[in-house]
Amino acid sequence: MINTYTIILISFLLILMAIIYRHEEAKYKTKIKIKPGMEYKIREKKYKVPNIKMVGDGFLLREDFMIKIRRLYLMSYLFFKKKNILTWVSGGTLLGFIRHKTFMPWDDDIDMHTFIENKSYMFSEQFKDDLDKVGLECLIMEGLTEEKSHYKGGIRMRMKGYKNPVMDIFFVEKVGNEVKKIENWNTEGNEYNLKETWKNNILLPIKGEFIDGMTVNIPNKPEEMLTLQYGEDWNKVMYCSHPPHTLAFDLLDFIWH
């Protein structure tokens, strides 16, 4: 049976977590609640949230943070283009560029994919050195190596001098007539994400589209890919209930190196 002291301790921890949550959230988000059809500005350019149903509470990111997200994307795009490494937007970032024609104004990280053939380089010291030269850095979760992944295998990138925003890059592999996102790996093989498994022609060829003043690499059939991952209503309903990625990263910063 739980005693009074345990209840007090749990209550204190919950209050402390709530205070930390609000403090961290204020670094990156405004108190402006996202509403369908609302307008906002980034460097005097006007944007408009799609006028469709919204589920959950989303809050507008700070303008300076949205500028940093854009800068991180452009810096990484130019880096990988120079290295002749193909990457493309995925997940919530792809959803943003297709549905909003820009980054979603409440999504605080960038999601990317690349082929498994690039994994060795991205786990190398050379990769870290090359990023350093252009003002970027790579972070890898504790326990994650080129040979073994136990939780959401991938790398994380950010601009030097900033804890956030971050870019997560996950690996995919061609398997027969399909391309599969790799969830984890070990010496026995790869584990795949069933929701992110596509016929070759849905993903390939990757297309460079000019969206919101940027060249954005997207899948061949992005609408079909979004339907497979998010369901038939991805362009009819906006879901905003997930906790900020920035908060989790700030609190768990010690597990990345």
Walk through the language-model features, giving the residues of each.
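Helical scaffold of the NTase/Pol beta-like nucleotidyltransferase catalytic core
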Residues: 29-90
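Terminal accessory/targeting
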Residues: 11-14, 29-33, 237-239, 243
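Structural signal for hydrophobic/aromatic residues that build the beta-strand cores
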Residues: 109-112, 213
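Active-site nucleotide-donor binding segment shared across nucleotidyl transfer reactions
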Residues: 77-110, 117-120
